[in-house]
């Protein structure tokens, strides 16, 4: 049996300042980016290390930083909830592939209102973040919630202060349901929110929302559960009001056509389906097609392969949606393009890549 390499991979939400020196070591596989996927990446890495002796240092610093770090070769892989377009990937010499799916949940801090009780539409949510709806008992909200005791209280929008894939997923959804959002704000990992308070990472937004009466924020669903925040019920494309759940995310994933997505560039917001959660997204890994460190590249791809297979159950337990088998096959076929500095393939098929 292969003796595991003495890799030092510690999964932690470390500061950006620590990235530079850590990447100098040749004995590490380093990743950085999405806080959206941090709960499942942390669990995967912990479990993978226990079974293989191989560790992974993933730093949850936000998708924007993750993209910058992989482009500057400070890390071995970046993770972003906003995919890069094929042209941008080609210029940088990168490839991307989805690693897990989840949902962005608008969450509120309103006394007496629990998970799923408050109903919102996409256009109303957009108007809240545009600063056009400022009170919780505003007519646009009251009409959606007859009988719900809505307070005459100011709405405090909480948003991301850093470049964020979670923001990208939310903004992409809002641009699809609100012309005002599309024209005034647009879609990016960092947008100019006209109102509200900024928090760093999903943890920061969850924290501000928990501490601020009358607040509304948006976080990955696992953070909403962990922080015991009340998610809203959101109207989907089919006109149904649904709450965030693994099953609702799965419905969105089932409607995505990955075979027709160049460089796996696919967005999952506002998909059809009665049970579909409308703010669903994927986290994408970004890696170089030509790898400078062969052994590191091999171990990195083995980790992702393991996450698709043995890690699927862990993703499910954390309310994420694991990768469908047909998509895994497409992804691992694309890995044939990953080579070392000498042009030799870095990926071995699962039948020969034992874990």
Residue map of PLM features:
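N-terminal secretory signal peptides that target proteins for export/translocation
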Residues: 1-5
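Bacterial N-terminal signal peptides
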Residues: 6-20
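Flexible loop/hinge segments at secondary-structure junctions
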Residues: 24-355
């Amino acid at each position: 049996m292969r003796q595991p390499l003495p890799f030092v991979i510690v999964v932690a939400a470390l500061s950006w300042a620590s990235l530079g020196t850590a990447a100098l070591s040749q004995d590490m596989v380093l990743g950085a980016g999405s806080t959206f996927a941090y709960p499942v990446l942390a669990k995967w890495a912990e479990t993978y290390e226990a079974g293989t002796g191989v560790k992974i240092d993933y730093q949850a610093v936000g998708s924007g930083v993750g993209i910058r770090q992989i482009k500057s070769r400070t890390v071995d892989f970046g993770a972003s909830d906003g995919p890069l377009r094929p042209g941008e990937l080609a210029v940088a010499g990168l490839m991307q592939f989805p690693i897990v799916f989840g949902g962005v949940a608008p969450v509120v801090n309103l006394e007496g209102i629990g998970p799923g009780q408050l109903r919102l539409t996409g256009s109303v949510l957009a108007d809240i973040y545009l600063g056009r709806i400022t009170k919780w008992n505003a007519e646009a909200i009251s009409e959606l919630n007859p009988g719900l005791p809505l307070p005459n209280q100011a709405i405090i929008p909480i948003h991301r202060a850093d470049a964020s894939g979670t923001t990208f997923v939310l903004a992409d959804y809002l641009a699809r349901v609100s012309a005002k959002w599309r024209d005034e704000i647009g879609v990016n990992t960092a947008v100019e929110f006209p109102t509200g308070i900024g928090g760093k990472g999903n943890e920061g937004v969850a924290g501000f929302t928990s501490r601020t009466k009358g607040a509304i924020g948006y976080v990955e669903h696992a953070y909403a559960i962990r922080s015991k925040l009340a998610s809203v019920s959101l109207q989907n494309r089919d006109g149904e009001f649904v709450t965030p759940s693994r099953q609702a995310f799965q419905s969105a994933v089932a409607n995505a056509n990955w075979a027709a997505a160049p460089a796996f560039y696919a967005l999952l917001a506002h998909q059809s389906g009665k049970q579909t959660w409308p703010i669903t997204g994927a986290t994408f890994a970004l890696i170089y097609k030509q790898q400078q460190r062969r052994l590191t590249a091999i171990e990195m791809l083995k980790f992702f392969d393991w996450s698709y297979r043995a890690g699927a159950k862990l993703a499910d337990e954390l309310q994420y949606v694991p990768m469908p088998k047909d998509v895994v096959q497409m992804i691992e076929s694309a890995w044939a393009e990953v080579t070392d500095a000498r042009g030799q393939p870095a990926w071995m098929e699962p039948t020969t890549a034992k874990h």
